[in-house]
Amino acid sequence: MAKIIGIDLGTTNSCVAVMEGGEPVVIANAEGNRTTPSVVAFKNGERQVGEVAKRQAITNPNTIMSIKRHMGTDYKVEVEGKDYTPQEVSAIILQKLKAQAEDYLGEKVTEAVITVPAYFNDAERQATKDAGTIAGLDVKRIINEPTAAALAYGLEKGEDHTILIYDLGGGTFDVSILELGDGVFEVVSTAGDSRLGGDDFDQKIIDHLVAEFKKDNGIDLAQDKMALQRLKDAAEKAKKDLSGVSSTQISLPFITAGAAGPLHLEMTLSRAKFDDLTADLVERTMAPTRRALSDAGMTPDKIDKIILVGGSTRIPAVQKAVQDFTGKESFKGVNPDEVVALGAAVQGGVLTGDVKDVVLLDVTPLSLGIETMGSVMTKLIDRNTTIPTSKSQVFSTAADNQPAVDIHVLQGERPMASDNKTLGRFQLTDIPPAQRGVPQIEVKFDIDANGIVNVSAKDLGTNKEQSITIQSSSGLTEADIDQMVKDAEANADADNKRKEEVELRNEADQLVFATDKAVKDLGEQIDAADKEKAEAAKEKVTTALAGTDVEAIRSAKDELSTVVQELTQKVYENMAQQQAGAEGAQAGGQDDNVMDAEFEEVDDKDNK
């Protein structure tokens, strides 16, 4: 059976893994790194992904970072005259990870398990699934990142215990409490903030640097795009440095220019100052942590293990806050950057049957309901309900002879409908005339194992039914997704063709150089006609290289290659003939100089 790969599609970095010999294994990228920056850049029609895209972000304004923060919204980014949705940009990253896995496995990969933050709403989950489809992947399961981390951690653990997963990534924060035992991974509660992550810690440093520089030089670096990108890179590096040292030097020469000439940014940032700048962010993570414990009906002493996930959990202040709250040190036996992808690979193994005796019971992170009279949200499914699940409730009309009801589907925890997230709307029509309160309208919610919602409404009097599968709020239809799949495939083909063209041009250019060298080295050994023929073929290649016709380059290169081969063959033949002639002459000369000599046999006996 074909492998199902596990993908951690992160805000800052992404990672791909697969089950090999009963163990999840991270697949390194072409650069040899185990994680790939979630960065996409466009340059003259060419797409760059990962490390190469991140490296040129300072000079290329068409660089897209942290697109995950916009999943499930109608946000679009315009690049080189084309609008890209977050799904399309994410699909480009997924395509790279897919190709990475195919290179490693030596076979085509078509199926994947993709992780999302536990606190992602339905629209964000659907958008992630769409991104996978656009990338040419059949997304077999969407699972929550903390749950994936628990799968990777608990695969070989036999004993029953309760774990708290604290997941602070580049752009999102989740905390989940799970009970593990006998191969059952049961999520008891989950909470989080899908707008909080390492990017926000970077931004605090950037704001500090901008403010200090403005105070010293009167120039606002926030208005300079190139300076801002340099500041972002420096802030990210400083944050990482401060996880291991107590202070770090930030040095950005020629950051901008003033009236007197170039200006440089030189600043020392201490860990104490960094902790002060980011104290509010660390505290923001503690509110969901407290809520998750409360929802689980637990106190910190009931937690057996704390597992930290996500690169931002390397920040000492974050580790201290978690330890102070729980009274326990975090478990150090997992790599926070890789554990989620490893868990996704385990889930892939569960689906293919490679991993046995593992049952995953996840929960819905937010309550689901509909708007009822008075703009109130009436909940049908409470948060932290184990999924998949189904729940129905009977409602009625609010007015006499009401011919239709609007079903406004909501997700959230607030009592008023307007304060919650709208997942979708649909209408049940042709309700027979009746006094208000008489018609019986059954509303049913279904949540599948991916956490994606289906809602139906049925008039119990007429059995007329209307249903809706909640689409991402970006409004992508099946036709939109199909078109994006075709575009992605076409772009992949175009990328391959562009690579082939570059290789062909390099080969042709190298052949021109080799021809020049051969003609020069052989000199008088080539007759004028052959030299002229080689020059003409070489000129044809040079002309083709100046144009855009790939076939013309290939044809001219092949022609020059043939001419050069014939030329060198003729030279070798001439050299062979000359050598043979020289050897013959030498042999003849030796015969002429032979002298006849008389000899007399001497008997040794006579000399004794």
UniProtKB/Swiss-Prot annotation:
Domain of life: Bacteria
GO molecular function: ATP binding; ATP-dependent protein folding chaperone; unfolded protein binding
Region (Disordered): 575-608
Biased composition (Low complexity): 576-590
Database matches in CDD domains: ASKHA_NBD_HSP70_DnaK-like
Induction, as annotated: By stress conditions e.g. heat shock.
Keyword field: ATP-binding, Chaperone, Nucleotide-binding, Phosphoprotein, Stress response
Stretches with biased composition (Acidic residues): 593-608
Pfam families on file: HSP70 (PF00012)
Phosphothreonine PTM positions: T172
Entries under InterPro entries matching the protein: ATPase_NBD, Chaperone_DnaK, Heat_shock_70_CS, HSP70_C_sf, HSP70_peptide-bd_sf, Hsp_70_fam
Listed NCBIfam families: PRK00290.1, prok_dnaK
Job of this protein: Acts as a chaperone.
HAMAP family in the cross-refs: DnaK
PANTHER family named among the record's database cross-references: HEAT SHOCK PROTEIN 70KDA
Family label: Belongs to the heat shock protein 70 family.
Listed name of the protein: Chaperone protein DnaK
Organism: Exiguobacterium sibiricum (strain DSM 17290 / CCUG 55495 / CIP 109462 / JCM 13490 / 255-15)
Source species taxonomy: Bacteria, Bacillati, Bacillota, Bacilli, Bacillales
Originating gene: dnaK
